[in-house]
Each structure stands twice: as structure tokens, then as C-alpha cells.
């Protein structure tokens, strides 16, 4: 079982990166699996469209240690989201190799999972960074928004350069 707010956060923070490309169908969902993070087990959701990657962790729910990794389809994520508004609700999650079930006291949502292998997303995440910076999320979002307005429609890229005491955004 997992609290509704935990599942809501996992899917809300990862769904923006779900691919809509039909040729790489295995990217058309959120990869939900148990992983190690700094010495403890976590429930991790990952999504990517090949350009953006979202990875979000939550404490591993009791009894989930043997859960197989599954790719939850985009449509299922959307339908499930409608069930997760009650903060006091516990969601019973059952997973097999081919299906996933989310059950509330009143509603059960069962879905096939995507039959495919999610790519090794850890290979694209830089390791051993010597420079790190913490920024206020809302200030950062506003700055990216301002710079993105002058980026080209084709690339929509915003470059980040970390200097000694500041972060410079450019197109």
C-alpha cells in the first residue's frame, strides 16, 4: 500500500517527460521500480522522451521490495491521477509482469503494462560532479521562462553555465 499523496507526487513530477513517439513505445509511460538511493531502497518513477528525463523517488512502501519494474502507460497515469486527490487514502498497488492494479476502497484500476525494456537512464545522468548549486525552484523557473521566450522554436534549448558564485542562463 502507498499513500495517495506519495503516488500523486511521483506521477505528477514525472509525467511531463513521457514520450508520445510511437516508434519507441517503451518510452510511452512511466517506469516504476524499486531502486537504491544513498543506501536505502526507494520507489522510483522515471520518464523520458529522449530529450527530457524525470526521475523522482519516494520511500519504498512496505512489502514492495520484490516488485518487478514496470512501465505504466501514459493513459493509465492520466486515469490514475483522477483517483489520487484524497490525501487520506491508501492505494493498494499490485504488480505482475504484465499488469498493474491500483485499488482504493471504492475503485480498482487495472491496466496492462508496456511490454518492453526501459533504457538504462542512469547512463545519461552525470556522476561525480565537483560543482553543485542549490537554487530556489520558483526563481529558477521564472528565469528559465524569461530566457526561453527568446529561444528558437526548433531547439527551445536554454544553456546553463555555472560560474563561481552564480548561474548564467542563455540561449
Task: Identify the role of each PLM range.
Residues 1-171:
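Structural preference for solvent-exposed beta-strand-turn elements
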Amino acid at each position: 500500500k502507498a499513500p495517495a499523496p506519495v503516488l500523486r507526487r511521483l506521477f505528477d513530477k514525472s509525467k511531463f517527460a513521457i514520450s508520445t513517439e510511437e516508434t519507441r513505445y517503451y518510452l510511452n509511460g512511466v517506469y516504476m521500480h524499486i531502486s537504491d538511493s544513498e543506501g536505502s531502497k526507494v520507489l522510483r518513477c522515471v520518464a523520458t522522451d529522449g530529450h527530457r528525463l524525470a526521475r523522482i523517488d519516494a520511500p519504498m512502501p512496505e512489502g514492495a521490495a520484490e516488485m518487478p519494474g514496470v512501465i505504466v502507460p501514459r493513459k493509465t497515469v492520466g486515469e490514475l491521477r483522477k483517483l489520487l486527490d484524497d490525501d487520506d487514502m491508501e492505494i493498494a498497488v499490485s504488480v505482475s509482469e504484465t499488469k498493474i492494479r491500483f485499488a482504493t476502497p471504492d475503485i480498482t484500476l487495472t491496466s496492462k503494462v508496456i511490454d518492453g525494456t526501459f533504457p538504462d537512464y542512469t547512463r545519461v545522468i552525470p556522476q561525480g560532479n565537483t560543482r553543485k548549486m542549490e537554487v530556489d525552484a520558483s526563481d529558477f523557473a521564472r528565469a528559465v521562462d524569461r530566457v526561453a521566450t527568446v529561444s528558437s522554436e526548433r531547439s527551445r534549448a536554454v544553456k546553463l553555465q555555472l560560474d563561481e558564485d552564480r548561474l548564467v542562463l542563455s540561449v
